[in-house]
Every structure is written in structure tokens, then in C-alpha cells.
């Protein structure tokens, strides 16, 4: 009942990042979070089992939603009494995503950002910038986000639990959600207006202006809105229905950067 209540919040206060710290490592709780996320255009940050890599991968395999983002292991933090204690990662990851949204924009991945207030991951996760055969990359390969130690404790992982590769990246999923939500909110004025040529042109241009603004911010690579005449038939308009299509291309995170080294003798002639 508590998780279901998240979908009852007012539209201007909708939660875009859903968590149940210390509970979402249980599948029933995670499923409930994902169900609400699906209805509210949110993402659910899911705590992993915090045992070993294989258990984390097995847990991730139980989900097939582009709105689920699984993080493992848990984190070790300093308690108020000075002792060390385990903490499920979802709350700090949610805070990191919100911070990234505010400082950089919703179209950026939260991966490779430092998680503050953390001593270390609950178990060591091997990682090296020039080594693909590490635990961190192994977990990422199976769409489990994790933490690596490099100038702080960093969140490491871009991928949701999507079965459709178009929505594999968390930042792409969230970019689509934010665009859809923004357009719906911005066009409340258009509901119940008379459907005229001017009306169709005005709505289309407002959407295109918004997409141009996003492109100028590098939030998308491009986009376009149009009113499809095959859908906007005389009968549809007579029934009070009008259709606006739009497309866009989201930027994709540089998950793997490959530098290829070539030793050549071509520049020897520059000696003289």
C-alpha cells in the first residue's frame, strides 16, 4: 500500500526516482516499485542482494523493465556514533541522479559520478580504466550498476534492465520521460480548444520550438513534430480527437572509449 501511494501524488510533485532502501532487494518490493514507475514515468533504483557478483546478476535476470536500475553491492558509511554500518545504495544513488539532473541536466548519465559520504563498497569491486576484464565491467555487462574506487567512490553503470535495446541506457529512458511529461504539462491550454488549422499549426510549432531548445542545450541531437493527415481524418476531428507525432534522438553515453595506437615512420621526414 505504501509503494502504491506514490502514484497518488499531485502531478507537480510526482516522484521521478522511486526507491525502497533496504527492501527492494526483495523481488516483490522491486516489482511493486517498477509497476508504479511504469504508471508514473519514473525509474526504480533497486538494491542488489549484497552477497556476490553472481547473485547480483541472477537478481537482475529476474527483471525485464527499462524502468529498473539495479545497483550492487551496498555501501559502508560512518554512523553517528562513529561506527561503520552497511547502507543499501538506492537512496544515495537517487540523490546522485537528482544532483546530476540539477547541475548538468536530465539527459546525462549518473554513471562515473562521485557518491559522497561513503567509506567504501561493502565488498571490493575490481576496476581499472584500461582493463576490460574487471568485476565492474563484468557486472555492467549484465546491466548491474556498481561502485568503483577512483578519486572517491563512483557509481559505475549506465544500463537499465530493458529487454528492448533502444531503452538500455538509463539516460535515454529518462530523457524520453522528461520530454513526454514536459509536452503534456505545457499543452494543458490546448485541451478543449477548437480544432482549426491555426490550432494545429500553433501546437506543432510550440512542440518544434521546445525540441529546438533541447537541441541547443545538447539534450537531444534533433527532433521534429508534425500532424499526420492519415490520423487526423475528418471523422477523428469530428470526434474531438487530434494527433500530433514527434520524434527525437537522444544522446548516448560513451560507455566504452577505445584509443587505437599506430606506430608509423611517416613523421621521420620532419626531423630535417
PLM features per residue range, with description:
Residues 32-34, 203, 224-226, 240, ...:
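Composition- and surface-driven signal marking solvent-exposed, interaction-prone regions
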Residues 41-46, 174, 207, 249-252, ...:
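Glycine-rich loops and low-complexity Gly/Arg-rich segments
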Residues 231-272:
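C-terminal edge-of-domain segments
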Residues 168-230:
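Acidic, low-complexity glycine/serine/threonine-rich segments
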Residues 1-185, 224, 228:
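A glycine- and small-residue-enriched flexible loop/hinge signal that marks low-structured segments
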Amino acid at each position: 500500500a505504501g509503494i502504491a501511494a506514490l502514484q497518488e501524488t499531485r502531478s507537480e510533485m510526482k516522484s521521478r526516482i522511486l526507491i525502497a532502501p533496504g527492501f527492494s532487494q526483495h523481488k516483490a518490493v522491486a516489482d511493486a516499485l517498477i509497476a508504479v514507475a511504469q504508471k508514473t514515468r519514473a525509474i526504480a533504483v533497486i538494491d542488489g542482494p549484497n552477497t556476490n557478483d553472481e547473485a547480483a546478476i541472477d537478481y537482475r535476470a529476474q527483471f525485464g523493465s527499462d524502468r529498473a536500475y539495479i545497483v550492487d553491492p551496498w555501501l559502508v558509511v560512518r554512523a553517528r556514533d562513529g561506527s561503520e554500518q552497511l547502507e543499501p545504495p538506492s537512496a544515495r544513488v537517487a540523490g546522485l541522479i537528482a544532483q546530476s539532473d540539477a547541475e548538468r541536466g536530465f539527459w546525462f548519465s549518473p554513471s562515473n559520478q562521485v557518491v559522497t559520504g561513503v567509506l567504501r563498497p561493502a565488498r571490493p569491486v575490481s576496476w581499472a580504466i584500461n582493463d576490460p576484464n574487471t568485476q565492474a565491467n563484468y557486472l555492467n555487462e549484465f546491466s548491474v550498476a556498481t561502485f568503483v574506487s577512483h578519486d572517491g567512490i563512483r557509481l559505475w553503470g549506465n544500463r537499465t534492465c530493458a529487454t528492448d535495446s533502444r531503452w538500455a541506457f538509463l539516460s535515454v529512458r529518462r530523457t524520453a520521460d522528461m520530454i513526454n511529461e514536459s509536452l503534456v504539462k505545457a499543452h494543458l491550454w490546448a485541451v478543449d480548444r477548437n480544432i482549426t488549422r491555426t490550432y494545429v499549426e500553433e501546437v506543432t510549432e510550440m512542440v518544434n520550438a521546445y525540441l529546438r531548445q533541447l537541441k541547443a542545450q545538447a539534450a537531444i541531437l534533433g527532433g521534429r513534430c508534425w500532424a499526420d493527415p492519415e490520423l487526423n481524418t475528418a471523422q477523428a476531428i469530428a470526434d474531438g480527437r487530434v494527433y500530433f507525432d514527434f520524434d527525437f534522438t537522444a544522446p548516448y553515453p560513451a560507455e566504452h572509449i577505445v584509443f587505437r595506437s599506430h606506430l608509423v615512420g611517416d613523421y621521420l621526414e620532419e626531423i630535417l
